Structures are given as C-alpha cells and as structure tokens.
Amino acid sequence: MDNFGFLKVAAAIPHLRVGDCDYNAERMAAMAEEAARRGVEIAAFPELGVTAYTCGDLVLQSTLLDAADEALERLVRATRKLPLTLIAGAPLRHGSALYNCAVVFTQGKVLGVVPKTYIPNYGEFYENRWFASGAGISDEHIAVAGQQADFGADLTFEVNGAEFGVELCEDLWSAAPPSSQLALNGAKVIFNLSASPEAAGKHAYLRQLVAQQSARTIAAYIYCSAGFGESTTDLVFAGNGIVAENGTILREAERFSPEEQLVVADVDLERLAFERRRNTSFRMNEGATENTVIEMEIPEGLRGVVLDRDIDPMPFVPKDEAHRSERCEEIFRIQSHGLAQRMIHTRAGKAVVGISGGLDSTLALLVTARTFDFLKMDRAGIIGITMPGFGTTDRTYNNALELMRGLGVTIREIPIRDACTQHFRDIGLDPDDRGAAYENAQARERTQILMDVANMEGGLVVGTGDLSELALGWATYNGDQMSMYGVNASVPKTLVRHLVKWAADTERDAATRATLLDIIDTPVSPELLPADAEGKIAQKTEDLVGPYELHDFFLYNFLRAGYGPAKILLLAEQAFEGSYDRATILKWLTVFVRRFFTQQFKRSAMPDGPKVGSVSLSPRGDWRMPSDASAAAWLREVEEL
C-alpha cells in the first residue's frame, strides 16, 4: 500500500432477494469483480447481505442458516482470484447462539469474523429476538465457509499495510461505538455493514453521524447499507453508501436507486497518520486495550493514475456560496475581535493603516472599521495613510482614496518619493539600480511613517500582510513584514479576495461597492517599480513568484496535510487539470519549497495576529521551525520529479 498513501475502498450495494442466499451471493461476486476492475482494494457489502436483513423469524430456521453458510462458502471461493479484500454480512451460529456477523475474506481465505456488539430492540428493531451480542467475545474461533477463523468484536485487520476494523449498523449509533476503540488500536479505516431503514429526517442525521465518527476517530469511515430488494412489508431501505474521511464526506450513493451501486473513493491513510501524530489527545488513548490484529499480504490489483477523489484547487475557500458567506462573516468577526482586544489592552485610541489600493490593505481597513464599530468608536480615529511612491499607479491611488472616503476614515497622503530619493543619496544607491535595496527602501520608508504617526497619535499600526506572503517571504523584512498587530496574518491570498468580495456584496453604499470590486480586479503588486509607458502596473507579483492559487494549494497540503512535494504535485495535476500543465506546477512548486525554507526568519519575527483558520504560521502557535533549517530533502524530492 504505497500509492502515495491512498487506499481505494468501496461500499457495494447489490440487488438482494429476501432469503435467496444463492442469488445474493452471485450478485455480491459480480460486484466484487467490478470492484477489482476499478482497482478497489477493500469493499464492504450491507449487513446480513447473504440472506437479506428483513428475513424476520426465518433467520432462526436451520434451512436458511445452512443455505447462508453454503452461499458464503461459494462467495469466498468465487472471489479467490481477485486482488481485493471483501467484507460480507451473514448470520452465523456459534455455540448455542446466533450472531449478526461481518465476514472478512481475501484470496479464498477468511481472515476473521466480527459479531455485532449492540443489538437494537426498540422501535422497528427486534434483533434481540434472533441475535446475541458479540460484546466481550475475544480470542475465539468460529467455523465459517468451511474454515476456522478468528472471532471477536475487537479484531483489527492489516492487509498490505492498510489497517482497518469493522462494526455493524447500530454499533455506530451507540454511546460508545466499537470503532472508537478499533481506531485507538490502530485501525485507520472503519467499515460499517448496515441495514438502516429510512424515515423522514433520518438521512441528514446519519450523514452527520458518519462524518462526526470519522472525525472523532481520525479515520476513514465506509458506511454500506442495504437497498433495493429488501422487504418493504413495513420498512424501506434506500441503499445508503457513504465514504467519509476525518469529518469530510468524500462520496455518497444515490438514495432509492433501483440500480446496484459501487461507491468508490480513495481515502488518504498518509493524511490520517499525519493527523494522528499531531493530535496529542488521540495519542493519549492509543493502545489502551489489547486486541487481535490479523495481517495478510495479497497481490496488488489495478491502480489508476486518476484518484477516485475530488481534489479541491481552493482548499481555503468553501465551494458552497452560503457556506462561503458564513465563513467570511466569521473570519471578519475573529479578526475584528482580535484587534479590538489589542486596542483595549494597549489603550490605543486610534488605528493607523497604510492603504495601497490593493487587496490586503483593503481587507485590513475593512476589519479595522468593523473593530471601531464594535468598540463604538468614531471611524475618524482610523488614520488611513496613502503613501505614493515610484510605482504607484493612478488606479491604485484613486481606489485608496475612494475607499477611505467611503468608509469614513481620516485620510492622510504622505508621498515617499522625495524621502526615498534622499535616502538613496545618503546610502550611495544609484536610483537606476532597481535591485532589492531600491524596492525594500520604499517598503521600510512606509513602515517608518506608519510607526511614527502611530506614536504621534497614540495609535496602533494595523498590519496588512497575509498568510500567503508570509509563506513565501514576499515581504520586506522590517518593512511591510512589521506592524503592531497583523490582522491578515493567517488569511491566505485566495481567501482575501473572497473576503473583500463578500464585503462588497454586503456594502450598502454603491460607490464604495464599486471601489471594492475594482480593487478585486486589480493585479496583485507591491508597486515598488515604476509603472509602464501607459501608466499601468508593471510589477505583477504572480509573474514573479507564481500564481497564488497554486501557492495556497501547496501551502495547505504541505502544512495542513503534511505531504511531500511528490504527492503535492500528483494532487495539483488533478486539481488544476486544464489550467496548469505539469511543468508549470513543478516550476512554482520548486519556488514554493525554496522560499518557504529560506524565508522562515521573517516569520520568526512576525508580529502578533489572530488565527482564523486551520493553517497558521505564527512562531508562537501553529508553526515552530528554525530559521536555518535545510530544505535539501524536500528539494531533492522535487528534483527527482
């Protein structure tokens, strides 16, 4: 299991006939063959799929139980040449009791049998009438499919390095699901064989339950429930198939479909292992109880280059418009509350913000305005300073002024050309030398102005730099890298644009809305080099360091998922198919890796700022990294691509 840590799993929902074990086994065998063709490595069928769930008292009859045993044995034999592991539901006799079981088998060998722990006997459920609970069963063996196999509720399995566990239907709905302990015992994938009937409103709760359990266990959770063919005497089974991973639903079946369904997804075991390593609370309970681990190596099946998994090219930005709007509102609240507390603590009566007419300073000013409203302070106490330099264009200059007017803040204009020209003379820099000193001197001059005005006014300098700039080190050390409180420090550039768009959409003043929309359409630039012959922006950030949508994708997957360059490239190729080719992605991935390591010294000295999402580079919080760490291993991996 070395396919970048991905494991292809499936919930297989076959047509069933109640009590017709031969037919049911045939359908399951056919679906197993289809799963193998699609490269599935582990597939689960519904609860009691060999007999069907709705047999009622017939399940106590020896005739049906014998037929189930024989059909299960044929199913194990029929799939013995397939390179995948299967999990089928069947009623099995053990001692004097009958158990509702999940049978795990591969290559003609039964690896183990897991009995259902929680036997529901309420509402429409009467399972206690037929089945015994598997609670407490451990270290036992059971006769199944002509073999002797391990039998117990505590079994975990490891096939080709992929660790998984099994529970059945009601087990998930209980206060202490067996899957929680299975996960603590090492299972990164949980399969649930279910036969859960429909009821109005129940499906939404089921989705939440599956997603939540996958999050709580930091695992992949594959839920496979009975569908077409179960008896509708009193109940309806819609055929729910859900694949979730650490709180996110990856794939779902079509409910109430008359067709057989194979719900396939690639789950990311590498990501799950990373999350468990970083989650100290999870580690505190690992291995708390002893359990039986059954290991097996089997030939690998077909593997496709394209993953059965949606790869989000914008991982920081919610896809759904309603969710995105809600997220933007929440982020603004976090930013403004963070700034409000800092202003109260420092007794700052005013805020000073450098306004360039670009996205970041616009967001910082919007946050500051909300902060003053929250504190019931006059927005006139916000001092917005525009500082035209050698590269300032009419478009950004006018947008800066219009934005400040629209928000009702105090406007100051302090050009920096003369001060920088004098500074160039003082240090002996030829103004025609447009290197780092030429650019950075302007950024530091602006920061000096902001700091000095803040001292004069008893105010606080609000920083504008964003998370993407911090990751790339695209900021002047002790220039725009420095402030007294950085409200955008954990907001990536791709999200900044959406936050400003949300502000525009909720802005009542038409002129201010128009200004915000034009700022969104303006190319990202530090404007430290002179404009072109037409007075337009000549220095475009994304031409120099690469597209921010790529860098934010790299950043999220590097930090939040712990991936290396090879896996990030694989995912980026799929996420940005049709937008960027492999060579382009690899070029900017190399830039990202190199700059991320070499620019850590700027992050080590970054000012305070609020964390707003799952990724932050604060050296006091989420990211602890020495400024002189070597990037050799990561760059070597890039070079090998």
Where does each model-flagged region fall?
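ATP/NTP-dependent adenylation/nucleotidyl-transfer catalytic domains that generate, transfer
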Residues: G19, N24, N160, A219, ...
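Enzyme catalytic cores with a strong preference for nitrogen-chemistry domains
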Residues: M1-G354, R370-R379, I411
